[in-house]
């Protein structure tokens, strides 16, 4: 993912 949190892998900014 791009710009994600390690705990919550979402394709953010």
From Swiss-Prot:
Highest taxon, organism lineage: Bacteria
Cited function: Is associated with lipid A, a phosphorylated glycolipid that anchors the lipopolysaccharide to the outer membrane of the cell.
Name of the protein in its database record: Lipid-A-associated protein
Source organism (scientific name): Porphyromonas gingivalis
């Amino acid at each position: 993912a791009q710009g994600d949190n390690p705990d919550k892998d979402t394709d953010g900014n």
